Amino acid sequence: MNIIVNGGSRGIGKEVVLYLAQDINNHIIVTGRNKKALNRLSSSCANVHTVSVDLSVLNKQSETFKKKILNHFKRVDVLINIAGILVAKEFMKIEDDEARLMMETNFFGPASVIRIVQPLMQDGAHIVNISSMGGYQGSEKFKGLSHYSASKAAIACLSECLAEEFRNSGISVNCLALGAVQTEMLEEAFPGYKAPVNAKEIARFISYFALEGHKFINGKIIPVAVNNP
């Protein structure tokens, strides 16, 4: 199985890579901004390859990114878009560049990755986009997460649309809207907050869903939370 984990240098993405890499039949490309963290991953797992990329400027580096992917894979079976950034500020206090960075990283970057990778996918392939309960319609909302939630709502809606656009190609697209998970990103945004689920636990669920979920589900936004957010 050829798998790309977009955003795997730390947190949930890293745990997904480590879990999937336990199966030697899985060959994984992991992308991220932190080159040192990526190198540590590839050094510890023989079936993991790394591609350093800044999603906020991927539109300017798309050809370079595609060449790096093609150096390892001619076919992609699974794409998991986990990359994300969170700036916890209320709507009237957030700076324009902070808001744009979240939208570039959480929406436009993953969308660009899909556009680059999709031609390498065949019938039976699966794209899994990771969203948030903050971007899940009808869920409880929280102060300081307006732009973050909007960016996650965007990737969720895109998932529904792409499932229809890619249907004739046999490529499934689903979205997991995660509740709070204990990660570095959460701790940095909300010091002292304790989530009910840790990164390793949710990584096992994401990995299983990425490999098997498309056999039963397509074009769905699935809430994965024991509480809100």
Regions found by a protein language model. Name each.
Residues I24-R40:
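Conserved glycine-rich Rossmann-like NAD(P)H-binding loop of the short-chain dehydrogenase/reductase
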Residues E90-F91, E98-R100:
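Substrate-binding pocket helix/loop in short-chain dehydrogenase/reductase
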Residues N168, C175-L176, P191-P229:
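C-terminal helical subdomain
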Residues C45-N59:
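Rossmann-fold cofactor-recognition segment
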Residues S9-R10:
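Conserved glycine-rich cofactor-binding loop
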Residues V128-A154, S159-E160, E164-R167:
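Catalytic loop of short-chain dehydrogenase/reductase
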Residues I82-V87:
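Conserved NAD(P)H cofactor-binding loop of Rossmann-fold oxidoreductase domains
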